Amino acid sequence: MVTSIALLLLRLTVGIIFLLHGAQKLFGVLGGHGLNGTTQFMENLGLRPARFWAIVGAIGEFLGGLLVVLGFLTPIGALLVTGVMLVAIAKVHWPKGFWNMQGGYEYNLVLGITAVALGLMGAGAWSLDAVLGWSALSATFFVVGLVVVAIVLLIAIPAGNWIAEHSGFGRDRMEHPASV
C-alpha cells in the first residue's frame, strides 16, 4: 500500500513535469515556444534535422509524461522521458557542470533517474497497468528498451548531423524567431 502511494506520487510529479514541458514544445503554451522555437533550439544545439529532433523530443516529453501520469504502458513512457533526459544532459547541460544554478545537469539527472526507477519498478497498484494486468511488462522490458534507446541515440544523432552536413538535407529554415 505505501509503495503504491509512493509510486503514484512519483508518477504524478514527474509525469506532469514532462507533460507540461512537452506541451510547451509542441503547442507553444505555458510560456513555451512551440515547434518552431523548439526546432530553432535543436538547430542551435547542432541536432539535425532539427525539425525531426524537435518533434521527437516534444512528443517524447508529452506522450511519455502522459503515459507515466496514467500508469499506462509505464515502461514505454519511462523510456521516452529517459531518452529525452539523456539527450538534454549530453547536449545541453553536461558542459555546464553538475549544479543547476549554472545550467548544469543536476535537475535533469533527478528527473531521468526517477524515470528509470519507475521503469524498473512499474507503476504500482494505482495505475492502468495494474488494472489491465500489464504490471509484468516492467523491469526486463525497460532494461532492454533502455539499451536500445541508448544505441539508437548514439547512432542517430551523429548520422543525422553527418547527412545534414553532406547533403543539405535537414537544414531547417525558420520563418519565425524562437521567441514567437
Residues of each region from the PLM?
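Hydrophobic, membrane-inserted alpha-helices
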Residues: 59-68, 92-93
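Membrane-interface interhelical connector segments
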Residues: 28-53
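Transmembrane alpha-helical segments of multipass membrane enzymes and assembly factors
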Residues: 68-74
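Hydrophobic alpha-helical segments within and immediately flanking transmembrane helices
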Residues: 41, 64, 83-87
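Short hydrophobic alpha-helical membrane-embedded segments
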Residues: 52-60
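Extended, low-polarity transmembrane helix blocks
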Residues: 1-30, 51, 74-180
